[in-house]
Swiss-Prot record:
The gene is bioD. GO terms for molecular function: ATP binding; dethiobiotin synthase activity; magnesium ion binding. Pathway: Cofactor biosynthesis; biotin biosynthesis; biotin from 7,8-diaminononanoate: step 1/2. Substrate binds at T41. Belongs to the dethiobiotin synthetase family. One of its GO terms (biological process) is biotin biosynthetic process. It comes from Corynebacterium glutamicum (strain ATCC 13032 / DSM 20300 / JCM 1318 / BCRC 11384 / CCUG 27702 / LMG 3730 / NBRC 12168 / NCIMB 10025 / NRRL B-2784 / 534). ATP binds at residues 12-17, 52, 107-110, 167-168, 197-199, 204. Homodimer. It is an enzyme of class 6 (ligase). Keywords: ATP-binding, Biotin biosynthesis, Cytoplasm, Ligase, Magnesium, Metal-binding, Nucleotide-binding. InterPro entries: DTB_synth_BioD, P-loop_NTPase. This is ATP-dependent dethiobiotin synthetase BioD.
Length: 224
């Protein structure tokens, strides 16, 4: 059962839309894909990232936990006065979707080192499952540093970063953004997969024109 983890250089970088694009791309390649959101914070019932992914892709997903306040998950649980997420619980939950022909696409919360529980991060979960990563980055001024730090943190933990993806690029990018697009691959040392246009409201049509060769490494499902 292969996993693919999607993390960001921070919050609000376009991680959910990027996850939707990757989910739809894999599904269009004939894979059985399950999108998963580990922890949602600061959203009302029936709202949030996993519901946005379903709206964008038509593929329903699963969510492990949610908290009321828009905070890091461990802080949100603490403030709410509830038991923090336990590492063994989240690993067991993910492994419960066991199916050798399914790809589980896991969207994190914020960045790679955000605490999901009091003593573990998304990086720890990805490492336990031997899962590769896609890092979603902003594209404007300051983004090169954030992307390089995220890839370096992943590499130091023995994680494989398949690529860096720009979560959103404006229709009329400024000079810093245009130069960053040329630099991401050089400074991070991993393939840069381009950037998603700002304001896209659906992934169908857009995904058909994209190519993510690194994802082709996932075993193709048998013909039916």
């Amino acid at each position: 059962m292969p996993f693919l983890f999607v993390s960001g250089t921070g919050t609000g970088v376009g991680k959910t839309f990027s996850t939707a694009v990757l989910v739809r791309y894999l599904a269009d390649q004939g894979h059985d894909v399950l999108p998963v959101k580990l922890v949602q914070t600061g959203e009302l019932p029936g709202e949030g990232d996993i519901f946005n992914i379903e709206r964008l892709t038509g593929i329903a997903g699963e969510e492990f936990a949610r908290f009321k306040d828009p905070l890091a998950p461990n802080l949100a649980a603490r403030r709410e006065g509830v038991e923090p997420i336990q590492f063994d619980q989240i690993i067991s939950w993910l492994r419960g979707f066991d199916d050798p022909d399914r790809i589980i696409v896991v969207e994190g919360a914020g960045g790679l080192l955000v605490r999901l529980g009091e003593d573990f991060t998304l990086a720890d979960v990805a490492s336990a499952l031997n899962a590769p990563l896609v890092i979603v980055t902003s594209t404007g001024l300051g983004s090169l540093n954030a992307a390089e730090l995220s890839v370096e943190a992943a590499n130091r933990r023995g994680l494989t970063v398949l690529g860096v993806l720009g979560g959103s690029i404006p229709q009329n990018p400024d000079l810093a953004t245009m130069l960053n697009l040329e630099e991401f691959e050089r400074v991070t040392g991993v393939p840069f997969w381009g950037a998603l246009p700002e304001g896209l409201s659906r992934v169908e049509g857009f995904v058909e024109k994209q190519s993510f060769p690194a994802l082709d490494a996932f075993k193709k499902p048998p013909a039916r």
